Amino acid sequence: MNILVLLPVNDRHRAILESSAPGEDFIYTSSDAATREQVADADVILGNIDPDMLTACEHLQLLQLQTAGYDDYLAAGTVPADAKLSCSVGAYGQAVSEHMFAMVLSMMKRLPGYHDLQREHRWEDLGPVTSLKNANVLVLGAGDIGGHFATLCRSMGAHVRGIKRHPLVYPIVFEDMDGMDALPERLAEADVVASFMPSTPETRGLANAEFFATMKPGAFFANGGRGDLVVADDLVAALESGHLAGAAVDVTDPEPLPETSPLWDAPNMLITPHISGWFHLEATLNNVVDIAAENLRHLQAGETLRCWIEH
């Protein structure tokens, strides 16, 4: 079995992968450097590859994505019909939640404003700040990342509720969980609204003018899920009017965010370029490698894959 590894692995990671499939042939490269010949010869691909390259596959058994998202691979015929597809849901909870938590807390403490003053050599007091202690936090998308984020907020004394499509099963860190029908009521109560929702027909454009108007005056909004949740002009309007105290996003639509986007200059807006879920935190890559190794074992044993995706 030829196993094409596109992940930026180190020696320890290689040992983990190779011990999960002893005697098999491992080829290590990167997504950018992988050739059509390597892809054509692969029985297993570990990592994300340009979907157009998959047309070269001749006997692919498994495409194990390094990302939690997989939208680019769902179009009919993208992944060979006989191949299995799996993702890395569960690998990014720590990294993304810590990043978004830091963004929210920095907004609540006016740190971006103080950074601007520092660059201008100005010693000024920007006034009152807010706290997560006793704050009402609403998490949209109560999966792995949302659960990690809720844990961080609870550690600061916040009250955390969640919204998810199937609210009957959820991490115990949430004090309560509702379905989407309760969204307007919960938005009106929350001091912080943080979204980690995937991109679906139901979520695209969900954060629009009505959404922001329903939010509590002076609340904060954060998006670490998918950029197409937000109608950018409506978010800008909510910030410019002062209805929202601030917003923090690590995802936008489109990406990269055009230089002409009004989001760049919106007041009390903090933007990072979709980097919270990359491999900047070593633990994230460790998690991805562990999932890949587990699925190599499952594949050889004919067992159900972890994070299996129907396509």
What are these regions (language model features)?
Residues 155-173:
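NAD(P)-binding Rossmann-fold cofactor-contacting core
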Residues 97-113, 155-158, 290-301:
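Oxidoreductase and adenylate-handling cofactor-binding alpha/beta cores
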Residues 167-262:
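Rossmann-like adenosine-cofactor binding region
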Residues 29-38, 51-54, 173-189:
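Short acidic low-complexity segments
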Residues 1-44:
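N-terminal glycine-/charge-rich "phosphate-binding" loop or analogous flexible N-terminal tail
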Residues 114-148:
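Glycine-rich NAD(P)-binding loop of Rossmann-like domains
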Residues 41-115, 129:
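Phosphate/diphosphate ligand-binding glycine-rich loop within oxidoreductases
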Residues 218, 224-311:
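Rossmann-like dinucleotide-binding domain for NAD(H)/NADP(H)
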